[in-house]
A protein has these predicted regions:
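Ubiquitin-like/PB1-type beta-grasp interaction modules and other compact soluble beta-rich domains
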Residues: 1-102, 113-114, 126-130
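Auxiliary tRNA-acceptor-end handling modules of aminoacyl-tRNA synthetases
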Residues: 53-56, 60-72, 86, 95-273, ...
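Hydrophobic anchor at the beta1->P-loop junction of P-loop NTPases
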Residues: 291-293
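Conserved lysine of the Walker
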Residues: 301
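Short beta-strand-centered segment that lines the nucleotide-binding/catalytic pocket of NTP-utilizing
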Residues: 314-332
Length: 553
């Protein structure tokens, strides 16, 4: 008698019986579900798996398409695989580094012992399309980890071998197209023909690989230059090469050798040096009356603001800190989003008229009374706090909209200095697996929300898509307006954050939507060796999230 298992599908609320060992692709065909952009993967008991994943027990399943974060990541990883194979086919002695997300794509470094030309890019793009058109199966293999480590070591891929040693797993999954094999952190598509849209062009000395838009997957987002952000990434990479930490495997080797404290000290010194340089530049421009700091959630804006203020004092200036949170309009006047909820992320939730009036009055030497927003009742009130600028005073204003030109439209640009703060993670898992900068910030937010706001990891993960949507609309479009970009990410921070984040992520129940993201983050953190936080100074930006800061928030 043929043995069967029960599958409950969330997409159509149906339950069916399938043969033991059926793949997710088999199940999808039996269910006869229609999806415009998929499926590309599925949640199996709220863990994301590829469509070639086999089922041996009763499962709850939800198929995902390109409009989901997991689906988009699956598609992107598959594109990385096809790109790496195409480069290998054309330049067998080359190596590829999938580097950083930038300009609505991913920057890719290719070493072919000379600078990459436009003709090279054309050849690579054509070879990628040939691989896609050939409809090559993408095979999934699961082998003992020791075997995978030997295989990648023999290929000369020591970064991948180091990473797999760090994971501590008994078995490792790797993928194969034709005779080319690679390892990816996460599942892939099952056939190269499922890639239907991509872009590839020359970008600086490397390539820019472009992927479909998450919300409208049949469109490639327009490439926008992000020269300032790119320069910060490359500067960080140069420093990492000096200290010998490019990948997680490199990092773990240093930690195991007892070098964790040195990494902390050097990273902290580098950040202080960068903040000092920004303060020096502000002090050198005598017309500056307003310093504006903006950045996405959990980028460390507040601590950056405090440390920058200290450095401004060291330059003979007298900073006056103002929070844009006190300039919210009354709740009943606040604009609403597409779901009918109050949209506090909107710039129009702020009293723009009052901001410009008060700032200009301060610059004229007049006294103003600052507002105070009561978040409990949603009303703006006079604070009783009066402010008047004296000689050498400079306003330091922090908030998500600080770089938006509309915020201070009536203040001359010559009086403004704009600082963009973000956590731009530059360490790689290995050459073909980058670490999303959003993961770094989400982990910061999870531990901060739990420690200071009484919000558990499940709720923080649940709110994150809404936060990201607001950032994409109100923050990221203005980051290139910055006069200075400050990278708040620390080379060692994931090794410290994991110790507080892992227990919180483990508390997310398996039967909730947020479990898949919590599981993904836990799986990612297992690659990283921990470092105790006792050597992190009280003025560290990370203390804003970890606790133990000497600053008052």
């Amino acid at each position: 008698m043929k043995q069967e298992i029960q599958i409950r599908c969330k997409n159509n609320k149906k339950s069916i019986y399938v043969a033991i060992g059926s793949t997710l692709s088999d199940v999808f065909k039996q269910l006869n579900i229609k999806m415009a952009y998929g499926p590309v993967c599925a949640k199996v008991n709220n863990k994301v798996e590829g469509m070639n994943f086999r089922l041996y027990h009763n499962k709850d399943i939800e198929f995902l398409d390109m409009t989901s974060g997991s689906g988009s990541r699956n598609y992107t990883r598959t594109l990385f695989f096809i790109l790496c194979k195409a480069v290998h086919d054309l330049f067998p002695r080359s190596y590829v580094v999938i580097d950083i997300p930038v300009s609505n794509g991913y920057y890719v470094d290719i070493n072919i012992e000379r600078e990459v030309t436009i003709d090279d890019v054309t050849q690579i793009r054509q070879r990628m399309q040939e691989i896609i058109d050939a409809a090559m199966p993408i095979k999934r293999h699961e082998v003992p980890t020791e075997e995978a480590i030997r295989m990648f070591s023999q290929k000369g891929d020591e970064a991948k071998a180091k990473l797999l040693k760090s994971a501590g797993s008994l078995y490792t999954t790797y993928y194969q197209i034709d005779d080319y094999v690679d390892y990816y952190y996460g599942s892939l598509l099952t056939n190269t023909s499922q890639i239907y849209l991509f872009g590839l062009e020359k970008y600086y000395v490397g390539l820019l690989l472009r992927i479909p838009d998450l919300k409208t997957p049949d469109i490639l987002p327009e490439m926008t230059r992000q020269d300032k952000m790119f320069s910060i990434f490359k500067e960080q990479h140069q420093w990492q090469n000096i200290v010998g930490v490019r990948t997680v495997g490199d990092f773990n080797e240093i930690v195991e050798a007892g070098g964790g404290t040195d990494l902390i000290n050097v990273s902290e010194a580098l950040q202080e040096k960068k903040i000092s340089r920004i303060a020096d530049e502000i002090a050198s421009r005598k017309d500056i009356k307003l310093v504006l700091l903006a950045g996405p959630s959990s980028s460390g804006k507040t601590t950056t603001c405090k440390r920058l203020s200290i450095q401004l004092v060291a330059n003979g200036l007298k900073p006056l800190q103002i929070s844009l949170d006190d300039y919210f309009i009354n709740r009943d006047q606040t604009p609403r989003d597409e779901n009918g909820e109050y949209d506090y992320e909107s710039i129009y939730a702020l009293n723009l008229k009052l901001i410009n009036e008060q700032f200009r009055a301060l610059f004229r030497g007049e006294e103003v009374e600052l507002p105070k927003y009561d978040f409990q009742i949603g009303v703006s009130k006079p604070s009783g706090k009066k402010l008047k600028m004296q000689e050498n005073n400079v306003l330091v204003v922090e908030g998500i909209h600080a770089l938006n030109p509309e915020l201070t439209a009536h203040i001359p640009d010559r009086q403004k200095f704009r600082v963009y703060v973000s956590a731009l993670t530059t360490i790689l898992l290995d050459d073909h697996n980058y670490i999303p900068t959003t993961d770094n910030r989400l982990l910061r937010r999870i531990i901060r929300d739990y420690k200071y706001r009484g919000v558990d990891a499940r709720e923080s993960i649940h709110r994150w898509p809404s936060v990201r949507s607001g950032e994409n609309k109100w923050i990221f479009p203005f980051q290139e307006n910055a006069d200075a970009v400050f990278n708040s990410a620390m080379l060692f921070e994931l090794a410290v954050i994991k110790q507080q984040a892992e227990p919180l992520l483990e508390q997310v129940p398996e039967n909730c939507e947020e479990y898949s993201e919590a599981y993904r983050l836990r799986k990612f953190l297992k690659y990283i060796k921990p470092i105790p936080n006792k050597d992190i100074p009280p003025t560290s930006l990370l203390r804003e999230f970890l606790g133990g800061s000497s600053f008052r928030y």
